[in-house]
Structures are given as structure tokens and as C-alpha cells.
Amino acid sequence: MKITGFTLLETMLALALLLGLLLLCSWSFFSLLQNNERETLVNSIKTAIQYSKIQAIHLGHPIYLLPFGSNENWSRGMVLAELNRKSNKTELIYQWQWSSNSWNINWKGVDSNHRIIISNIPNRAMSNGKFILNNRRTNEKVVVTLNRLGRVRVE
């Protein structure tokens, strides 16, 4: 009687090939996740700036984009606020939150590193500067530049 089946060598070779394909797919999947997270953060920043410009025109006075929380790190999100002239306190208009553990986001502006002033007059100057996104895992760096007219460019 003849016994059929795979030999140990054939089984080990098939498992090694399967492991190689699995490693290749996991690296590709990790890269895809990193790219999607980067694009989501950049698009969120662009959307926040566009929404802020519209709200400033609608409200008729300058408003501010501030980091979410009390620090100068924008990694947790940003807050759109206006200054109440009667109470001299900032009031929340809208907030954006993102949970990005691998990205560090900082704002380097001309007049301030902890706020962006959004003008209510479209052709009047507003804060300009750069959002610098640094990936802690891959050391990737993305720069989102905001010019004085509110246009956004990604480098």
C-alpha cells in the first residue's frame, strides 16, 4: 500500500513561502495605513482653514484657530473660537479632533506659534505660517503652508 501526503521538506517550503507573502502584504498594508493617516490629517487641516475663512466672513469679525487643549501641540486637534468683546473671553465655534498617535503637528506662524488669526475680509491679510507634521515612527515630514490670503499648499 502506498502512503500519499506531503513530505516534511515540501511542508516547510510551503510554509516559508506563505510566511514571505504574509510579511510582504503586512508591510504594504502598514504603508497604506500610514499614507491614509497622513492624507486624512492634511485634508482635515485644509478643511478647518476653509471652514474658518467662511465662518469669519459670515460672522463679520476675525476669529482664531487654536490648538485643542492648552498646549502648543496641534496633534490632538484644533478649535475655532471667537473673542467675545463683552466678557473678553474666547467662545468655541467649532472643534476638530483627531487621534493620531504617530504624528506630531506643530504650527510655526509669523505672529504667533499658538494661534492663527482668520480675517473676516477676504483680501485682508491673515496669519501665515506652516503646519509641520512629523511622523514619529517613520520620520516622515510634511509641511502644510498657509499664506496671507488663506491659500493652503502641501510640500
Segments predicted by a language model, with ranges:
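N-terminal single-pass transmembrane signal-anchor helix
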Residues: 1-29
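Short amphipathic alpha-helical/adjacent loop interface patches that line ligand
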Residues: 15, 42, 49
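N-terminal helix-rich module
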Residues: 24-39, 47, 54, 58, ...
